Amino acid sequence: MAIDINRGTAGLLELPAEVSQDIWAQTLENSVVQRLARKIELPAGGLQIETVLTEPEAGWVGETDEKPVSDHTFGSKIIAPYKVALIELFSDEFRRDKAALYEQLVQRLPGALGRKFDRTVFGHDAAPGDNFDTLAAAPDVALTGSHEGYVNALTSVAAAGGDLSHWVLSPTAEIGALNDVDAAGKPLFLPDVQADGTIGSIYARPAVKSKAVAEGTTVGIAGDWSQAVWGSVEGIKIKFSDQATITKGSDQINLWQRNMFAVLVEAELGFRVADVNRFAKLTQAAAGE
């Protein structure tokens, strides 16, 4: 029985190990979260991040009066790396006879890592561990076809001490925003595609588009992305094997016996936010509801 990628399968080519940096760049391009959040250097053992919770407050004083004493308050979180990985199998004949494996893998494998990372951060998939934050508990804000939903998102983020910096919209939310108007009847969403990945702005805040943000009634995420950090331990790793036995579902696949090889791509990533309430999930009822 033929298994997975062979000469009859359309779409991939051989990936030399030295292209790891190119692959990592593609992973960044496929992850909205990694573009918007602040990147930190993440050691293998994790890192304690100090956060400022409140600011000191000054006061007016009269002549000879005691000066007020006020302090910052601090908090801390541990950001730890967790491994995200993917193995894909190919036939030796496919590697020999097809000339496009490198190009296709550059496009596909990084996208898989980026999508998984984003879906986890957005709260659609479970966190890999306790020291990895998601936005699953962010407050819901309903988009109702007018400006009110976007104003409510701004208000929700501000009430938690944040300043909404970016909108992350699904294709559905983008279409909805194009039809929405503000209180004066003017278009709410101002399209303006830029090289940095933004597609326009809503209330002077840049908007970016991501398919990964859509799940159920959630069509977008808005928030103060200066309050989010992500890190990677060593970047992306790529490994090849034609000797291993791979478990796929209930099948044990001996690569040597079948003249096949496996490509493994993996990375160790972490994500933390100072306060999940400085984000908002943009929701929209399904058509007909």
Predicted features along the sequence, with ranges:
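Extended oligomerization regions of viral-like shell subunits
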Residues: 43, 139-261, 265-267, 289
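Alpha-helical scaffold segments that mediate packing/assembly in large oligomeric complexes
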Residues: 75-78, 85-163, 266, 281-289
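Structured loops at beta-to-helix junctions and adjacent beta-edge loops in soluble globular domains
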Residues: 50-53, 91, 170-172, 210, ...
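Short helix/loop capping segments that flank catalytic or ligand/cofactor-binding pockets
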Residues: 57-60, 98-99, 176-179, 272-274
